[in-house]
A protein has these predicted regions:
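An N-cap/entry alpha-helix motif that binds or orients negatively charged groups
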Residues: 1-16, 126-147
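N-terminal capping/small domains of soluble enzymes
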Residues: 1-99, 105
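Short, small-residue-enriched loops and turns at beta-alpha junctions
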Residues: 31-33, 85, 113-115, 141-142, ...
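Glycine-rich beta-to-alpha transition loops that act as phosphate-gripper elements at the mouths
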Residues: 36, 57, 83-84, 146, ...
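A structural motif
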Residues: 50-51, 102, 160, 182
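Short, ordered loop/turn segments at secondary-structure junctions
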Residues: 58-59, 110-112, 168, 190-192
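Conserved anion-binding
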Residues: 101, 105-141
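Glycine-rich phosphate/ribose-binding loops and adjacent secondary-structure elements
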Residues: 151-210
């Protein structure tokens, strides 16, 4: 108590990228399900903030269009991807992102298979059949069930961008990711929707810090 808090500064940096405050946008698929402008509307809404937006590989807008929309803003763009069973999908996505000016690659690690999410089965949206992924063919790609920490090293070999691994909840996994070449990790349990029985994210943060 009794500390001078009259001049609070929330600015920080992540992997050398300055941000106004330590809050960014996690990857969310198919923004056009929520609004016709999709990811472009999201960029417009946060373009005045100097923060990080992670674009989902299952975005409903071309990543090149998102990059153009963000180029005159203070927004830092990172591209999320998976290790797909056909590595060509991953390679192409990463290289397109790098060519478009993205500043980081986020690898989702907690999806070796596509989970059955019961709430998604129960819920239906009027436009879900009309909104498709723009950067990959959602009907052809599959997650790789054989992906390992070695794939972080492989991913690092095909890009100069920093690799951020998302979906780790233990200190042991965090250490393995860093040893494999990851520049950072994102502690995440995928909103509790991917792996049944996952601990809460704040528990994973504690283990990872240790």
């Amino acid at each position: 108590m009794l500390r001078d808090v009259s001049k609070n500064i929330l600015e920080t940096s992540t992997l050398g990228q300055k941000v106004d405050f330590p809050i960014g946008l996690s990857p969310v698929a198919l923004h056009k399900l929520a609004h016709p402008e999709g990811e472009l509307g999201t960029v417009a809404g946060i373009s005045s903030f100097r923060t990080i937006m992670i674009l989902s590989s299952f975005a409903s807008t071309l990543l090149e269009e998102v990059a153009v929309a963000a180029q005159n803003s203070s927004l830092h763009l990172w591209m999320q991807t998976y290790i797909f069973d056909n590595r060509t999908w991953t390679t192409t996505l990463v290289r397109r992102a790098e060519m478009s000016g993205f500043k980081g690659i986020v690898l989702t690690a907690d999806s070796p298979i596509d989970a059955t999410v019961t709430c998604n089965v129960r819920m239906s949206l009027e436009n879900e059949d009309q909104v498709l992924t723009a950067n990959i063919d959602q009907h052809k790609v599959k997650f790789s069930a054989s992906a390992t920490f070695k794939d972080i090293s492989w991913l690092k070999s095909i890009t100069k961008l920093p690799i951020i691994v998302k979906g780790l909840l233990s200190g042991e996994d965090a250490k393995l990711a860093i040893l494999a070449g990851a520049s950072a990790i994102l502690v995440s349990n995928h909103g509790g929707r991917q792996m049944d029985g996952d601990p809460a994210t704040h528990s994973g943060e504690k283990f990872s810090r240790e």
